[in-house]
């Protein structure tokens, strides 16, 4: 369901589609594609479970006056956690949470290795991984969920497809913009935002753009904007068949020179 409503444009679009009999076709992923998505989702959910468990262990330590943050899960930190003198039920909770953590870690590592193996089989995934901040998980998810770049005429359509553009409810001469539409894959949106933040830390140009947006708007808005920028950049890298270093020769969205999003 389209979440951008503007009466005149919608009317023109419907009229053109009826006149040309050119309604868009629906792309359906194949069985292998759908099964590999299960691999991505399975790992994602297990990582979320692990994060919740680690947060609970942090809370247990803080209740005893210890604030170790990430150090809690190093070998010395864990040893200190296990030495804490706790009440009976708190002690049992600590033990069972640590047991769950010990079971999750090797499973997540196994799934991560499987994702990396699948990524190495696909040249287009390896090409996307040349972009700063983009690892095997993000690149493979992007390729599986987008399917084929030829489905889209320009990079701007990618932002719409992944649900990272504002909702719009406009009529007459009034334009009303809301939150992002959140259409498409929530997993891909999450990965794009995470990868964009990694790119901000590694790439000076991305850091400059993010800082500018964060100062003008808000950090959360800037993060989504950089995630959308990354989605468009990856689209053009994939469609045109070049790596990150070559993409720097083009515009800010790595499309065609001088055309903004790459579309004429």
Regions found by a protein language model. Give the residues of each.
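Short alpha-helix plus adjacent loop in nuclease-associated cores
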Residues: 1-25, 34, 38, 77-83, ...
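Basic, amphipathic alpha-helical segments enriched in Lys/Arg and hydrophobic/aromatic residues
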Residues: 214-263
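Phosphate-backbone recognition surface of nucleic-acid-processing proteins
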Residues: 127-130, 136, 140-220, 254-256, ...
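Short coil/turn segments at secondary-structure boundaries
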Residues: 28-31, 59-62, 70-75, 115, ...
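Short, amphipathic alpha-helical segments that act as regulatory/interfacial helices
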Residues: 15-19, 40-43, 47-50, 54, ...
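Glycine-rich, often acidic, oxyanion-interacting loops/wings at catalytic, nucleic-acid
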Residues: 40-127, 253-254
């Amino acid at each position: 369901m389209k979440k951008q409503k503007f009466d005149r444009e919608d009317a023109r679009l419907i009229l053109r589609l009826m006149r040309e009999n050119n309604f868009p076709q629906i792309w359906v992923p194949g069985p292998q594609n759908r099964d590999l998505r299960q691999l991505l989702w399975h790992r994602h959910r297990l990582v979320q479970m692990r994060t919740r468990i680690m947060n609970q262990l942090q809370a247990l330590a803080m209740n005893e006056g210890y604030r170790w943050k990430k150090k809690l899960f190093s070998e010395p930190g864990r040893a200190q956690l296990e030495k804490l003198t706790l009440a009976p039920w708190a002690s049992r909770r600590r033990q069972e949470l640590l047991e769950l953590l010990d079971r999750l870690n090797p499973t997540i590592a196994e799934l991560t290795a499987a994702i990396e193996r699948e990524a190495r089989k696909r040249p287009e995934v390896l090409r996307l991984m040349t972009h700063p901040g983009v690892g095997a998980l993000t690149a493979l998810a992007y390729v599986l969920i987008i399917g084929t770049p030829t489905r889209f005429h320009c990079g701007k359509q990618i932002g719409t497809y992944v649900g990272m553009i504002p909702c719009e409810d406009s009529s007459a001469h009034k334009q009303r913009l809301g939150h992002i539409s959140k259409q498409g894959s929530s997993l891909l949106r999450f990965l794009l935002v995470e990868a964009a933040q990694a790119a901000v830390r590694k790439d000076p140009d991305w850091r400059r753009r993010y800082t500018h947006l964060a100062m003008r708007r808000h950090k959360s808005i800037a993060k989504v904007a950089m995630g959308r920028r990354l989605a468009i950049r990856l689209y053009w890298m994939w469609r045109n068949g070049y790596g990150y270093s070559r993409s720097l020769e083009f515009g800010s969205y790595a499309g065609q020179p001088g055309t903004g999003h790459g579309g004429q």
